Regions:
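Primarily marks secretory-pathway-exposed extracellular/lumenal segments that are disulfide-
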Residues: 1-172
């Protein structure tokens, strides 16, 4: 394995990322594979921090799968510090398009994303630009949850009374 560290011989490790040219998130600069190659078209999460009185570092987010496993995170949830009035964009690899996922917004101070002003927002879009989650998160909370599915769920059996011709995933 090319990426390692040793307690007695500290060194700067090689850049990690996806080293498979066939993946959508291939990183030509990566020397070590981080195991996070994405072979599906990723969703895009756009975050705008607005004027946060210098406290945008409290903002964070996670995307969890149906089992509660974290598949992506950013901001304070990922030791990343946000700045006020700044746009951030993330590609999120979803492997099971028929599953239900949870976008969780965090405010570690507990006063919401729009403490000093309005305008902080999160928007999750699919590869075609369709909005799956859009919010301007208001004041006075420490966590907000938004459930979403990358595909339309419903009855895919054309002989059933509740058949949904637009459904891609059968919801049982």
């Amino acid at each position: 394995q090319c990426c390692w560290s040793q307690e007695y011989f500290p060194f700067s490790s090689s850049p990690e990322g996806c080293t498979d040219p066939a993946a959508n998130n291939y990183d030509a600069n990566a020397l070590c594979d981080d195991g996070l190659c994405c072979y599906t078209t990723p969703l895009t999460l756009d975050i705008f921090t607005a004027d946060w009185c210098g406290n945008a570092s409290y903002m964070g987010w996670e995307v969890q799968d149906a089992n509660g496993a974290i598949i992506a995170s950013g901001g304070s949830q990922n030791s990343e510090s946000y700045s006020d009035n700044t746009n951030y964009s993330y590609d999120i690899c979803i492997t099971d398009t028929c599953s239900i996922y949870n976008l969780i917004l965090y405010d570690n101070s507990g006063n919401g994303w729009n403490y000093c002003s309005s305008g902080a927002s999160a928007t999750l879009t699919d590869p075609n630009g369709n909005v799956m989650v859009s919010t301007t998160a208001n004041c006075c909370w420490s966590q907000k949850d938004y459930l979403f599915s990358p595909s339309i769920q419903g009855c895919t059996d054309p002989t059933a009374n509740n058949y949904d011709a637009t459904a891609v995933c059968d919801d049982g």
